């Protein structure tokens, strides 16, 4: 006779899994769009591409996680924004190629299904999808006892977007003389957290450091990653942007050259970079070399645009936010990024 409790005895709570699905339905519903087909719970998420109205559609996809920022979410028991981070990391990558996000899928793996906690995680994913204009059409929650501790979980996601073939941004339009415009980040975003955790390993998170302008350390460290989709899409539609760089792991040094050809370089005026207080604190308390900061973090600029000089004012007008004119594209001599 089959022991009905055998799976539970191995550490997998099927009923908790069902509860998670029921809890997240209302959050998923917030993200629905015209192209969504079918209901949550099928074997595959479906999306009707014809609803986009794109004449020559090119699908552009991206996948990412949030790295060890998750460890701080677990440490501080705050799980309602980490999902936004996951969405942001994916959709900001595909917007850099000119894609409008269509849909998103998430993957959560945990040592023990805790429905209330996982609902918070997925609620954050849904909020990120709303901000990005993407539908959350599927996902997976895997309970894996023995692989993860009971309080641990991992989170990853996958975004798919669409671009008109003629509006793909691949760096081929970036030329010498283009102006580099920086869009502000919301904070550290989701990269460099192994170093961040080392720097603040002995802190509780409740500290209000003088550099942080009255905010608790844990609030600043868990500030969700900014999603740039709605700000940048109008620029893409008007074909005002030649190149876009999402400043993630590797900071300026690794990411900026990804948006132009090998014979070009980015010359950046450091005095124009809106360095956020958290980066000053990290440099100070971590005793990190100043030049290395630009090799690791976004330093206050989460997205960089290469724009023809004659389009700069129109771009600023459409963005309707603080835009930082931080440099220009030059002919490459030695380095791909020159910070002065």
UniProtKB/Swiss-Prot annotation:
Q: Which UniProt keywords apply?
A: ATP-binding, Cytoplasm, Ligase, Nucleotide-binding, Purine biosynthesis
Alphabetized SUPFAM superfamilies for the sequence? PurM C-terminal domain-like, PurM N-terminal domain-like
Q: Which domain of life is it from?
A: Bacteria
Q: Which GO terms describe its biological process?
A: 'de novo' IMP biosynthetic process; adenine biosynthetic process
Gene Ontology annotations for the cellular component aspect, listed alphabetically:
cytosol
One annotated GO molecular function? ATP binding
InterPro entries linked? PurM-like_C_dom (IPR010918), PurM-like_C_sf (IPR036676), PurM-like_N (IPR016188), PurM-like_N_sf (IPR036921), PurM_cligase (IPR004733)
Is this entry keyworded Nucleotide-binding? Answer: yes
Give one Pfam hit by family name: AIRS
Known catalytic reactions: 2-formamido-N(1)-(5-O-phospho-beta-D-ribosyl)acetamidine + ATP = 5-amino-1-(5-phospho-beta-D-ribosyl)imidazole + ADP + phosphate + H(+)
Q: In which pathway does it act?
A: Purine metabolism; IMP biosynthesis via de novo pathway; 5-amino-1-(5-phospho-D-ribosyl)imidazole from N(2)-formyl-N(1)-(5-phospho-D-ribosyl)glycinamide: step 2/2
Give the primary localization class: cytoplasm
Family annotation (CDD domains): PurM
- EC number(s) from the headed UniProt entry: 6.3.3.1
The subcellular localization recorded is: Cytoplasm
Report the sequence similarity comment from the record: Belongs to the AIR synthase family.
List, alphabetically, the PANTHER family matched.
TRIFUNCTIONAL PURINE BIOSYNTHETIC PROTEIN ADENOSINE-3 (PTHR10520:SF12), TRIFUNCTIONAL PURINE BIOSYNTHETIC PROTEIN ADENOSINE-3-RELATED (PTHR10520)
Q: What is this protein called?
A: Phosphoribosylformylglycinamidine cyclo-ligase
**Taxonomic lineage from the root:** Bacteria, Bacillati, Bacillota, Bacilli, Lactobacillales
